[in-house]
């Protein structure tokens, strides 16, 4: 009997639905790629320069096993068209399948795919080997966003898939009774992933607990982290009302090796701002504050409030920052879209441990993000960092910064 293993990611996503940094969401569930390296587990420049696997200019190689497939000439990421997928009235999914004429070696890679959807949903890239064992890569795609490349992370394994001999590729979007909207896909690629897993530690919103709770834990291991500030909420004095960092505390975090990045001016949902606010001012004003206050290097990096984005916020993130973080899944590969780097938000202790174990086992890049810490989440952070220390000491993981990611792991 085949084993079915959810390597922490599924549990982490379930928890993320209750996180302080992401809206509650419900998920529907059912059951030549070899690379050269520089010798340290880091893909070489040549290895990361991958040609597209499929540009969807010719759809004959694909079969819509569930739902309908058609070319969309009015919407494309590359070339003259994309593939449009639509589910039928009684379908619980759309499923596009490509059977390969010969097994393909996709070991050590992660998929990237340009995706747009009318309804917010997880999208799945599933690889199946000759024995029928499979691995699911996923990413959350938001409604109202343009057709852009998404970096997919590892979600689950069924059996023991041999990724050096992939026979089928499935593109899947689960649907419900009230979310039968179209999905567009284009430009399927496979990017190399570092053999030695890379981990980023992040804190959203610029809460004072970054300084009072997180910093002492990370200092014990000499680990860097990133504090993404809602800059208009930073206090000038400890006596000022609020639960966000004081300006001097931000400086001490930076002096301790932390990256000070942006979570926008107010840390509000950029897809649903109140009157008088817009993504352009929320993002550009926060960057200006960071630059004016001596945090120029961190001003290059951004995390989307509540992990939500649309076309306007994507455009402004790209215009103002080198990297931006959103998503739900761990162990991505080289960032094919540097403004949608994946992350796992507010995991519980067990989920954080599983995500770290997954990254140690499979490599790739995982960002663990927390919001304001309370007693429970502080305990989770402490346990996760302790386990991270064990895996790092064993040579199985490495803690990196956004600058490291930008320098070495962007396509």
Model features per residue range: what roles?
Residues 4-20:
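N-terminal export signals
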Residues 19-28, 34-35:
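Bacterial lipoprotein signal-peptidase II cleavage site
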Residues 32-68:
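Extracellular carbohydrate-recognition regions
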Residues 40, 156-165, 170-203, 207-210, ...:
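C-terminal active-site subregion of NodB/CE4 polysaccharide deacetylases
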Residues 72-92:
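Short carbohydrate-recognition loop motifs
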Residues 87-95, 103-154:
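Extracellular ligand-binding interfaces
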Residues 197-199, 219-311, 320-322, 334-340, ...:
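Metal-dependent polysaccharide deacetylase catalytic core of the NodB/CE4 family, i.e.
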């Amino acid at each position: 009997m085949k084993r079915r293993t959810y390597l922490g990611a599924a549990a982490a996503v379930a928890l993320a639905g209750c996180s302080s940094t992401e809206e509650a969401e419900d998920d529907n569930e059912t059951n030549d790629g070899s690379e050269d390296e520089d010798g340290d587990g880091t893909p070489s420049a040549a290895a990361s320069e991958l040609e597209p696997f499929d540009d969807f200019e010719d759809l004959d190689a694909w079969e819509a096993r569930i739902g309908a497939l058609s070319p969309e000439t009015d919407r494309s990421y590359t070339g003259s068209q994309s593939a449009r997928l639509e589910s039928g009235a009684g379908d619980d999914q759309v499923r596009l399948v490509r059977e390969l004429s010969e097994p393909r070696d996709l070991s050590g890679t992660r998929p990237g795919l340009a995706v747009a959807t009318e309804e917010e949903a997880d999208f799945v890239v599933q690889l199946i080997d000759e024995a029928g064992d499979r691995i699911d890569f996923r990413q959350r795609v938001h409604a109202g966003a343009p057709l852009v490349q998404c970096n997919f992370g590892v979600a689950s394994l069924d059996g023991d898939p041999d990724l050096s001999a992939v026979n089928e590729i499935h593109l899947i979007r689960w649907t419900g009774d009230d979310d039968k909207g179209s999905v567009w896909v284009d430009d399927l690629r496979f990017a190399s992933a570092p053999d030695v897993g890379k981990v980023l530690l992040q804190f959203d919103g610029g809460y004072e607990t970054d300084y009072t709770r997180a910093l002492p834990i990370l200092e014990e291991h000499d680990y860097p982290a990133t504090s993404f500030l809602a800059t208009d909420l930073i206090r000038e004095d400890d006596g000022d009302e609020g639960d966000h960092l004081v300006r001097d505390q931000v400086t001490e975090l930076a002096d301790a090796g932390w990256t000070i990045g942006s979570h926008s001016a107010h840390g509000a949902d950029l897809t649903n701002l109140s009157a008088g606010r817009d993504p352009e001012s929320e993002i550009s004003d926060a960057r200006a504050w960071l630059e004016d206050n001596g945090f120029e290097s961190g001003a290059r990096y951004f995390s989307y409030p509540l992990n939500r984005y649309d076309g306007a916020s994507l455009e402004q993130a790209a215009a103002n920052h080198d990297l931006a973080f959103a998503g739900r899944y761990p162990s991505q590969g080289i960032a094919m879209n540097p403004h949608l780097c994946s992350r796992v938000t507010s995991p519980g202790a067990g989920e954080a441990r599983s995500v770290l174990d997954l990254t140690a086992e499979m490599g790739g890049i995982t960002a663990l993000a927390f919001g304001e810490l309370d007693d429970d989440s502080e305990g989770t952070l402490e346990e996760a960092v302790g386990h991270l220390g064990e895996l790092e000491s064993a040579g199985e993981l490495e803690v990196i910064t956004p600058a490291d990611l930008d320098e070495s792991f962007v396509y």
